[in-house]
Amino acid sequence: MLRTGAPNGDLPRAGEVHTGTTIMAVEFDGGVVVGSDSRVSAGEAVVNRVFDKLSPLHQHIYCALSGSAADAQAIADMAAYQLELHGMELEEPPLVLAAANVVRNITYKYREDLSAHLMVAGWDQREGGQVYGTMSGMLIRQPFAIGGSGSTYIYGYVDAAYKPGMSPEECRRFTTNAIALAMKRDGSSGGVIYLATITGAGVDHRVILGDELPRFYDE
């Protein structure tokens, strides 16, 4: 299994646990939708079918995890700790851009030791909903982003289906359809779909179970 963000495109170490994955985030006016599948594997074995890959960094900021499960969670934990201190010093919630910079810096600093890619998405009072990619020390804001091993199967779909100005419900449907398509094609993605809709009012968590997933023409 090749992992997005793995140094030099290397293969996983034997027995290592991976979130070999489909993750996605979409901006809308007033917030973001972030989603993921839930399969975790070690080699050929599925070790967790319902792992939530959406990890909170702060009250209105989440990251989506891919790569080595342990490495990705370690980066998320370090970033959450730094952002908590940052918020205490400023006496106000951190910006989403600040969170993305923290994740980017950790990922780049430990690029030879940790194999993970985190997508950062959230809401703040200055810029509203934002989505950032942080792979390999890069930092770029996008209206939507996909990642993980399953993303290679859905580039055509998301490019064709994305429309600027979508409502929160349209973004949830767009994210659900894209991840379900990836889960159908990618053997390293599967399980259920976790969704988080982040706005100034808070975070709305949803789980799309297996019998609720969209069905496509070949099923």
UniProtKB/Swiss-Prot annotation:
Example GO biological process: proteasome-mediated ubiquitin-dependent protein catabolic process
Induction / repression: Up-regulated by interferon gamma (at protein level).
EC number from the UniProt entry: 3.4.25.1
Gene Ontology terms for molecular function: endopeptidase activity; threonine-type endopeptidase activity
Signal peptide: none
GO cellular component: cytosol; nucleus; proteasome core complex; proteasome core complex, beta-subunit complex; spermatoproteasome complex
Active site (UniProt): 21 (nucleophile)
Subcellular location: Cytoplasm; Nucleus
Protein family according to the UniProt entry: Belongs to the peptidase T1B family.
Protein name: Proteasome subunit beta type-9
Gene symbol of the encoding locus: PSMB9
